[in-house]
């Protein structure tokens, strides 16, 4: 019978120990379909073929390699090692883990040791004078107390039994906050990878525009020389010479602006890699081609966004944390059971301090139950529920925004490719028109104004084509950023454990 009672008590204790009040978290349904993204071509003319298409194949975690640019790949690898924003996000992971350790410590007993020594002398006119009343009648003397030594080392221990899961819910919320911090770092990394690619592409675009301006300057200078030669022969007037000179000056004026853009983009990349201004100039000042886009871009399916985009993952982790906080608020309505104990050695002499007769202790449980809090606990609970609902709405909005980001990026990528194709045709036609205009001018059939107008059209068409080429590559970068790729294989991976502690110190 005794064994049965012991078993029943043990089973009850285990049940209480495993009790977690409040709702258990269930991962939300993102609502994203497991089918390919709707074709962005539906918003463009069906008669035009797109130079590049998207495929439902999985997104390459190292998407920047699709541009086949070794310099870009090198920059992407280095930014995760050097960027200051990423280092800050890494330290926030460490902070979250330390906060989790602080919350988990409440599951364990606390033990405090203390030791005290006092030398005491009581006043003979104070409470010690009452001892005179204890002296035998007729003794003629009264007892007195001299100086005393008091040695009292000891230990205090307490342990709150987490019967309702309050501490376990706090630890659960802290674990979710760690996940949120890790996904915040991933989100920072995704943005950095995209920013590096965007700045690098813009740098190559500025260099391409600079080279284009220099080439057109040579063309315009040739026209000016030709016009002066014709003037010397009496075949044209000074007006044509001045118009040609003005055209040369106009093209020459474009060069400083492109040089400024080049310097700004190099400095932007230097900042991302924690380098001083012009820190990458020696490496990047030599002009290179704008990174070309691949023939086919794998983009996966919408349902993969919930697992790949860090902002969606972070929103889910924050929803998890808010759900666990409801359990913490519910547990506040239940009794708190605590085991307390005190062990002290008390002696007036050091020699007797370590004897068994010097031991004194107190031990036993204590129970506290909220009876009247003026509605405080209920308000805290309702606040936790409202915060959980807010987190659920934020999750839904994040998912919906991610879907829109991808579709909008697809549309931009497709339409810009079509624009670039048309601009390529314009460049080809305008160059041919310039050749014909110069020939007719040399033959005296066309005036010089026609040549200048066509030359100006060539320059504008070439600049627009270069800018469109830049935009196509940047739109693909934006598409991959919207897809959330790039954090799965980082340089380096987020440090954990001892590395985070060292970073925090």
Identify the residue ranges that each predicted region occupies:
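Short flexible linkers and secondary-structure junctions
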Residues: 20-195, 337-341, 371-381
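Sec/SRP-type N-terminal targeting helices
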Residues: 87-88, 104-105, 161-189, 239, ...
């Amino acid at each position: 019978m005794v064994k049965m009672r012991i078993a029943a008590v043990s089973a009850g204790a285990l049940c209480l120990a495993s009790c977690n009040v409040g709702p258990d978290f269930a991962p939300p349904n993102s609502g994203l379909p497991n089918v390919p993204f709707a074709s962005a071509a539906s918003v463009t003319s069906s008669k035009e073929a797109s130079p590049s298409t998207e495929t439902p194949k999985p997104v390459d975690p190292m998407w920047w390699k699709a541009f086949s640019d070794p310099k870009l790949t090198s920059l992407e690898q280095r930014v995760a090692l050097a960027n200051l924003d990423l280092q800050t996000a890494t330290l926030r992971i460490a902070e979250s883990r330390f906060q989790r350790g602080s919350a988990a410590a409440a599951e364990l007993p606390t033990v405090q040791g203390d030791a005290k020594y006092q030398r005491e002398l009581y006043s003979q006119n104070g409470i010690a004078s009452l001892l005179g009343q204890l002296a035998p009648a007729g003794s003629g003397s009264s007892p007195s107390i001299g100086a005393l030594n008091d040695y009292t080392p000891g230990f205090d221990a307490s342990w709150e039994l987490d019967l309702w899961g309050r501490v376990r819910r706090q630890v659960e919320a802290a674990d979710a906050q760690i996940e949120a911090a890790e996904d915040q770092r991933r989100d920072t990394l995704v943005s950095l990878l995209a920013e590096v690619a965007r700045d690098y592409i813009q740098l190559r675009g500025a260099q391409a525009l600079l080279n284009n301006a220099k080439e057109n300057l040579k063309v315009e200078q040739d026209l000016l020389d030709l016009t002066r030669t014709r003037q010397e022969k009496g075949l044209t007037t000074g007006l044509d010479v001045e118009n040609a000179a003005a055209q040369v000056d106009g093209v020459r004026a474009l060069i400083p602006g492109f040089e400024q853009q080049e310097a700004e983009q190099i400095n932007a990349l230097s900042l991302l890699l924690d380098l001083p201004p012009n820190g990458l100039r020696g490496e990047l000042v030599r002009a290179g081609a704008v990174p070309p886009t691949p023939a086919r871009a794998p983009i996966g399916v919408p349902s993969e966004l919930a697992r790949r985009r860090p902002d969606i993952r972070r929103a889910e982790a924050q929803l998890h944390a808010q759900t666990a906080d409801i359990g913490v608020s519910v547990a506040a309505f239940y009794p708190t059971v605590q085991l307390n104990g005190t062990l002290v050695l008390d002696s007036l002499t050091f020699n007797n301090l370590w004897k068994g007769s010097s031991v004194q202790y107190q031990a036993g449980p204590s129970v506290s139950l909220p009876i009247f809090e003026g509605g405080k606990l209920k308000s805290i609970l309702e606040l936790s529920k409202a915060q959980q609902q807010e987190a659920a709405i934020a999750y839904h909005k994040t998912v919906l925004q991610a879907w829109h980001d991808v579709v909008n990026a697809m549309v931009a990528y497709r339409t810009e490719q079509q624009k670039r194709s048309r601009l390529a045709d314009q460049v080809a036609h305008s160059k041919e028109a310039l050749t014909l205009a110069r020939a007719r001018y040399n033959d005296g059939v066309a005036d010089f104004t026609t040549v200048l107008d066509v030359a100006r059209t060539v320059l504008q068409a070439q600049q627009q084509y270069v800018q469109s080429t830049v935009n196509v590559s940047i739109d693909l970068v934006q598409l991959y950023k919207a897809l959330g790729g790039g954090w799965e294989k980082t340089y380096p991976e987020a440090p954990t454990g001892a590395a985070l502690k060292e970073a925090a110190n």
